Swiss-Prot record:
Source species of the chain: Prochlorococcus marinus (strain NATL1A)
SUBUNIT field: F-type ATPases have 2 components, CF(1) - the catalytic core - and CF(0) - the membrane proton channel. CF(1) has five subunits: alpha(3), beta(3), gamma(1), delta(1), epsilon(1). CF(0) has four main subunits: a(1), b(1), b'(1) and c(9-12).
The keyword ATP-binding appears for this protein: yes
Name used for this protein in its record: ATP synthase subunit beta
Coiled-coil ranges from the UniProt annotation: none
Subcellular location: Cellular thylakoid membrane
């Protein structure tokens, strides 16, 4: 593996060709760097401009040349400049020193808080844990979000996909999860911003400072490290920043023996960057223009995200779905690695149901009686069958109206509408837009609430009382308030 390739450390090559973010470098015979080695180019070009960039070797071309992909812009780079072989892959800082800080793909701080002192570094390319080191006993990870905990529970040390098109609330849901995990579980999180908007990254950082997830006074008390390679970065940076974030998370798991949360927003941008790099390297594209190595690229990242006997990395990955098409190769390949999927539906967002998690499309391998228990399993399945029946009846209601339904079906529709409303929930991170305080709902309260709706105990309460509340006690309080307002 490239991590051990130190024989060529310090060898100097000459840049022979630059095409956008891809450069060809010629080295002395017998001194070629290994694939994945980092090359460092520093100096002044003939125009007197300072040039400083790192590139990663991707191909050995023959004629003593290698082809590398730059991790930053190649502006000012000219043929004839010297490139130094570092003899190892890109390495990033790891450990407590990373908490509360923002890094780029190379592990350089970009938050204007100064350089890191006496920090341990680790290469971003490494093998997945061996089979004998893996933890195989399933354990549910409580998030405090009703629709997730009840219908598509997350596995501790598992991989979760957040699927949805543009603007249906993936990033807000990720922010809420980081907030809940930090406050309720005292967990450490690593956030990998892969190819998303710079503004969102800045907003996220400011929100973390406001909520105390990042402690501005004492960074060591922060609960999250951030690693960003945003939309404006070259494809090389967007392709590798996910690995940089993962490397930081692995250190907390393997060395500190902690349970870690790794957020990747957005895993589709990782695939998209790989596709751009693949085309620049001259590889033949496969279906829909994606790279021929799509399965391998995704697999190398995903297989490192796992639970070991020492600790766990639970990963929550936002997956942008191009044109809302779940059969697109990028989301379809990602599906194969996931333990749970949280699918966000535009139709629910249009109705004002937030989080807009689709209760029928979202799935989890954890939702089985042997893992979650009989009561949880029965409640979840009853909720889904009620919602499914409501979905089937919608055409009849649209054509003939509610009055044409049987008494039993009318009851089902009434309860389904209450369930749909009760699956909404105010978020802590959305307080600024909604003016409503966020709610963290314990799993037992969630199960109790839905059982009461299904049993008919709450049939007399108005539908609106179930909208944007936490537990069932809040529903009752809201119903009383609505009744008193109606009288007034």
């Amino acid at each position: 593996m490239a991590a051990s390739a130190t024989a060529t450390v310090g060898t100097k090559g000459i840049v022979r060709q630059v095409i956008g973010p891809v450069l060809d470098v010629e080295f002395p015979a017998g001194k070629l760097p290994s694939i994945l080695n980092a090359l460092r180019i520093e100096g002044k070009n003939p125009a007197g401009q300072d040039v400083a960039l790192t590139a990663e070797v991707q191909q050995l071309l023959g004629d003593h040349r290698v082809r590398a992909v730059a991790m930053s812009g190649t502006d000012g780079l000219v043929r004839g400049m010297e490139a130094l072989d570092t003899g190892a892959p890109i390495s990033v800082p790891v450990g407590e020193a990373t908490l509360g800080r923002i890094f780029n793909v190379l592990g350089e701080p970009v938050d204007e808080q100064g350089d890191l002192k006496n920090v341990t570094t680790s290469p971003i390319h490494r093998s997945a844990p061996s089979l004998t080191d893996l933890e195989t006993k399933p354990k549910v990870f409580e998030t405090g979000i009703k629709v997730i905990d009840l219908l598509a529970p997350y596995r501790q040390g598992g991989k979760v996909g957040l699927f949805g098109g543009a603007g249906v609330g993936k990033t807000v849901l990720i922010q809420e999860l980081i907030n809940n995990i930090a406050k309720e579980h005292g967990g450490v999180s690593v956030f990998g911003g892969v190819g998303e908007r710079t503004r969102e990254g800045n907003d996220l950082y400011e929100e973390f400072k406001e909520s105390g997830v990042i402690n501005s006074e004492d960074l060591t008390k922060s609960k999250v490290a951030l690693c960003f390679g945003q939309m404006n970065e070259p494809p090389g940076a967007r392709m590798r920043v996910g690995l940089s974030a993962l490397t930081m998370a692995e250190h907390f798991r393997d060395v500190n023996k902690q349970d870690v949360l790794l957020f990747i927003d957005n895993i589709f941008r990782f695939v998209q960057a790989g596709s751009e790099v693949s085309a620049l390297l001259g590889r033949m594209p496969s279906a829909v223009g994606y790279q021929p190595t799509l399965g391998t690229d995704v697999g190398e990242l995903q297989e490192r995200i796992t639970s070991t006997l020492e600790g766990s990395i639970t990963s929550i990955q936002a997956v942008y779905v191009p044109a809302d098409d779940l059969t697109d190769p990028a989301p379809a390949t990602t599906f194969a690695h996931l333990d749970a999927t949280t699918v966000l539906a535009r139709a629910l967002a249009a109705k004002g149901i937030y989080p807009a998690v689709d209760p029928l499309d979202s799935t989890s391998t954890m939702l089985q009686p042997s893992v979650v228990g009989d009561e949880h399993y029965r409640t979840a399945r009853a909720v889904q069958s009620t919602l499914q029946r409501y979905k089937e009846l919608q055409d009849i209601i649209a054509i003939l109206g509610l009055d044409e339904l049987s008494e039993e079906d009318r009851k089902t529709v009434d309860r389904a509408r209450k369930i749909e409303k009760f699956l909404s929930q105010p978020f802590f991170v959305a307080e600024i837009f909604t003016g409503m305080s966020g709610k963290y709902v314990k799993l037992e309260d969630t199960i109790k609430g839905f059982n009461m709706i299904l049993s008919g105990e709450l049939d007399q309460l108005p539908e609106q009382a179930f909208y944007l509340v936490g537990s069932i006690d809040e529903v009752k309080a809201k119903a009383e308030k609505l009744a008193s307002e109606a009288k007034a």
